[in-house]
């Protein structure tokens, strides 16, 4: 008998995702955050289940790794909170203040 060919090849779902580093600029309800990526785009990020179950706190000004789908680049899943260095964190907090000022001036 002839064997059936597997028409649907199994692909790794991680191949459809791209990982970026970003800075949390705003905390929203239900574990959602606005994250500014390295290329200065701002996307909506949500906490992954592993971070949620580990009770890891993510605050404004934290640097995070975020996994973004190739199909919808406006949303991403926060998969890791990067350890912060005091000097870098201070620079980032100044960046956040500048970003807020520029957003306020637009309104």
UniProtKB/Swiss-Prot annotation:
Transmembrane segments: none annotated. Keywords: Chloroplast, Initiation factor, Plastid, Protein biosynthesis, RNA-binding, rRNA-binding. Its main location: plastid. GO terms for molecular function: ribosome binding; rRNA binding; translation initiation factor activity. SUPFAM superfamilies: Nucleic acid-binding proteins. Residues 8-83 form the S1-like domain. It comes from the Eukaryota. Gene3D superfamilies: Nucleic acid-binding proteins. It holds the Pfam family eIF-1a. InterPro entries: NA-bd_OB-fold, RNA-binding_domain_S1_IF1, S1_domain, TIF_IF1. SMART domains: S1 (SM00316). Component of the 30S ribosomal translation pre-initiation complex which assembles on the 30S ribosome in the order IF-2 and IF-3, IF-1 and N-formylmethionyl-tRNA(fMet); mRNA recruitment can occur at any time during PIC assembly. Belongs to the IF-1 family. This is Translation initiation factor IF-1, chloroplastic. The gene is infA.
